[in-house]
Amino acid sequence: MNLQKISKKIDLKKGAGLIPTIIQDFYSGQVLMLAYMNKESLEKTIETNTTWFWSRSREELWNKGATSGHFQYVKSIHIDCDGDALLIKVEQLGPACHTGNRSCFYTTLI
């Protein structure tokens, strides 16, 4: 499927141009992180086979692993039934979280 067809399936209007993206370990199924993508970051992700996101705080694109070396290699991309959320299954190199934890979801609330 080409980029134009993929872009048509995604509803970027609901999230003001951003789409929440869940990152999951391809092999273990562990949820690693949640980040946001825009059209450009999704295109770069598909083109490079590594994850790219939109930083809401810095207001810029960032390639996961570019600084740390903890790249995420894309195995598959899925869209939810409403077209307003993505699930990307990756091969994760090293920890996904900036704290050094494997997953950003390491704190139990209940």
Swiss-Prot record:
<keyword id="KW-0028">Amino-acid biosynthesis</keyword>
<dbReference type="InterPro" id="IPR038019">
    <property type="entry name" value="PRib_AMP_CycHydrolase_sf"/>
</dbReference>
<comment type="subunit">
    <text>Homodimer.</text>
</comment>
<dbReference type="GO" id="GO:0008270">
    <property type="term" value="F:zinc ion binding"/>
</dbReference>
<comment type="similarity">
    <text>Belongs to the PRA-CH family.</text>
</comment>
<feature type="binding site">
    <location>
        <position position="104"/>
    </location>
    <ligand>
        <name>Zn(2+)</name>
    </ligand>
</feature>
<dbReference type="GO" id="GO:0000287">
    <property type="term" value="F:magnesium ion binding"/>
</dbReference>
<feature type="binding site">
    <location>
        <position position="97"/>
    </location>
    <ligand>
        <name>Zn(2+)</name>
    </ligand>
</feature>
<comment type="pathway">
    <text>Amino-acid biosynthesis; L-histidine biosynthesis; L-histidine from 5-phospho-alpha-D-ribose 1-diphosphate: step 3/9.</text>
</comment>
<dbReference type="InterPro" id="IPR002496">
    <property type="entry name" value="PRib_AMP_CycHydrolase_dom"/>
</dbReference>
<dbReference type="InterPro" id="IPR026660">
    <property type="entry name" value="PRA-CH"/>
</dbReference>
<keyword id="KW-0378">Hydrolase</keyword>
<dbReference type="GO" id="GO:0004635">
    <property type="term" value="F:phosphoribosyl-AMP cyclohydrolase activity"/>
</dbReference>
<keyword id="KW-0368">Histidine biosynthesis</keyword>
<keyword id="KW-0963">Cytoplasm</keyword>
<feature type="binding site">
    <location>
        <position position="84"/>
    </location>
    <ligand>
        <name>Mg(2+)</name>
    </ligand>
</feature>
<protein>
    <recommendedName>
        <fullName>Phosphoribosyl-AMP cyclohydrolase</fullName>
        <ecNumber>3.5.4.19</ecNumber>
    </recommendedName>
</protein>
<feature type="binding site">
    <location>
        <position position="81"/>
    </location>
    <ligand>
        <name>Zn(2+)</name>
    </ligand>
</feature>
<comment type="function">
    <text>Catalyzes the hydrolysis of the adenine ring of phosphoribosyl-AMP.</text>
</comment>
<dbReference type="GO" id="GO:0005737">
    <property type="term" value="C:cytoplasm"/>
</dbReference>
<feature type="binding site">
    <location>
        <position position="80"/>
    </location>
    <ligand>
        <name>Mg(2+)</name>
    </ligand>
</feature>
<keyword id="KW-0479">Metal-binding</keyword>
<keyword id="KW-0460">Magnesium</keyword>
<keyword id="KW-0862">Zinc</keyword>
<dbReference type="Pfam" id="PF01502">
    <property type="entry name" value="PRA-CH"/>
</dbReference>
<feature type="binding site">
    <location>
        <position position="82"/>
    </location>
    <ligand>
        <name>Mg(2+)</name>
    </ligand>
</feature>
<dbReference type="GO" id="GO:0000105">
    <property type="term" value="P:L-histidine biosynthetic process"/>
</dbReference>
